[in-house]
Amino acid sequence: MNLKLFPVLFFCLLFTSGLFAIENTKDTLTNQSNKPLRSYTTTRLTTARPTIDGVLNDACWQTGEWAGDFTQLLPTEGAKPTQNTKIKILYDDKNIYVAIRAFDTEPDKISRKLGRRDELYGDMVGINFDSYHDHRTGFEFTVTAAGQKIDLILFNPMAWDMNWNAVWYVKTGLEDSAWVAEYEIPLSQLRYSSDKEQVWGMHVWRWIDRLSEESDWEVQSMSGPGMLYAFGELKGIKDIPKSRRIEIMPYAVGKLKTFEKVPGNPFADKGRSWLGNVGLDAKIGLTSNFTADLTVNPDFGQVESDPSVMNLTAFETLYEEKRPFFLEGLNIFKFEMGDANLFYTRRIGHTPEYKPELGENEYLKYPDNTSILSAVKISGKTSNGLAVGVLQSLTANENAQLFSGGKTKDVRVEPLTSFTVGRIQQDYKEGNSTLGAIFTATNRFINDPYLEGMNRNAFTGGIDFLTQWKEKKYFLDAKFIGSAISGSADAISNLQLSSARYYQRPDAGHLNYDPKRTQLSGQGGSLKVGKGSGLFRFSEEITWKSPGLELNDVGFMQMADRVEQETEISYFVNKPVSIFRTYSVGIHQSNNWDYNMNYENSSFFFTSAFQFLNRWGIAPSVHYGTDWLNTRILRGGQAVLIPAIWEGNLMAHTDVSKKFFVNLSASKEKAGENHFTSTSYEATATVVPYNPLRLSFSLNYTKNQDNLQYVDTKVLVAGTKYLLAHLDQKTLGATFRVDYFITPEISLQYYGSPFASVGKYTEFKEITNARAKNYSDRFEVMHPMLLGGNYVFGSYSISNPDFTFNQFRSNLVFRWEYKPGSQLFFVWGNERTGWKNDANTKVGNAITQLKDVASNNIFLIKLSYWFSL
């Protein structure tokens, strides 16, 4: 069958089966939508405010209305909960007060396990306010039975941001046959309209850990289009003042770095250095629904290091954001399209791009990150449904210190740079449709000729549109993006030659490399249509990116010059059936072309997940990829035909509510012609020997054998040679965590992660006929001589590419939230990194040899103090 016709035939089949399912499947959402919304009418506080101590003996709790009659969501949707729950809500001009009484006929089995803040752990109760009442944003305040806080922002359809840390007060306590939670939530932590009488969306839920049971005050459905659409209503809030909140948090930090002494190096001859810093974070309520966040000279040190990675591809590794300023409230700035994102926050304050080459007896003190002078973001939503977000950040002229000829001088390694991001989204048709736009600008003020390889100005923009119909069952999601980059000829040449596009590819007739260009522009987009609620769901999507599209100045994108088509079908069962508590199955199919519609490959996935009645679970999946015309493997050379590949994966876990539980995973990949094989295993065990202490250990091992691993490109008089080899790579990693919780506010945590990867290159090859029908005709096996650490191939040579990379990273962190919003940290960070150009070490021995690698340490103390005006 012609694979180019497959998406058309597949979509026809999908559409037919979708119509059948619509006609014959009882849709939980439809039945749910016909039920009236639950509502709760709160009472204004007329007595003294409660003392937040987890004991409901204050006079105010004798007023107001208790509400109950929760409905089970898990494990049996719509059933009566096994335990009763009651809530009461009061308010005044400053706070919302909440009491939740979680009854339990077996109080000795209440799970009061301590965990980190924002960790869903043990028995829990929570309340979520959709204070905009727009069915798009919910502010959640959850507490565990042990008293640990969990706060998050909920978004539809089923996404959340757990990095939002509000300042609020809660205590828990025990009664004869219940546990209780007593809240004080400042109105300053919420955003709401200026209406005289407020109506908010409200969701209240409870989790019983030993039963894996969730019950909700309002009726929710796992098959719905999103939780916020099914929220109940909170009424009765009247005449509350407009919020003009001002929150300020200054901080001070001191660091001691220790490292290996290097005689003659003035930056390392003492083996230590002292650093100190002060700064300020502020949050200003411009109106009751718009907030400005400001940071001056921020401390963006990360408490936990990035994981170790051995990246042998041509593409950048995407790392998770961990800095609070760039985490909180940034959901509005998200604009993702496939693997591309117009705003990747780690571009701001990144490691400097330029690094000078050193001569003999020269030493360099190089900054880890670019200094952020200031950053401001303004975000909020009007009563008419217009969401607005603006972020602006300025990073400094960053200098390294170069010691040469007995003197030290500053060398500019990153120019002064301005980053601007703007985002708007307008709701229509009672939240069923949204229209939005985004704009980003990166402006570098370059005054040094050797920095002209960087882009001077980069602008990107996009428009997105989402509409839903038939009670939000069906949706159409459309995005259109564009970019315009300007800079020197060197800068634009770098973009043309980069792995995102490789304009120099000799067999890409639609591409034209021009070394004199000073501008580059491109566009892209995606169209997705499908059924997004109910037990049966499907979608069809097409995504395209023109060759000139470039997002990487303040966004993230690995590949341009792409057209992708994807089809997804899934079926979910959300009630116990036979031995299963829940299960889901899915099919995913995709086709890929370059922008000139030259076919590259197709992929087919089968995924599934099963949870058993004993709360153990497994998730098997299978992937098949057809023969692949890989346009990136030679990093600028012609496309190479790669054999088809099979992949199988299996994940399994035991009951995570137990004091000891295990997660396991295994995968196997194998391509035809013995082109590629990969086997990987990972196991994680977690044990809670007694309540305040938790231990976790994970071990992972991967073995890869790649017959066409890229090595080098040599431009010779006789022509360009693309050199590849057979790579045998083994990777071993482990992670050990210890968490000890003295109280919910005081904890001691340790994280340690050794990592090693050993790679041996053999059977070197030159590409001869990249698309030959027979695999062995696509290359010629070479027989170089190894002389003095170099492989000699006659007219050229390369250094030995074998490697042994090992690294150890660890953190020991003492945290004390001595008052809400204010913290004291003591941190010890340790890192050891080794590298050798040989593969004579077994990967396990490379781990043990870390003890002989020089150690770098950071000892840090940080104090922050939060107050409001």
Say what each PLM segment does.
Residues 169-174, 261-283, 449-456, 516, ...:
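Outer-membrane beta-barrel proteins
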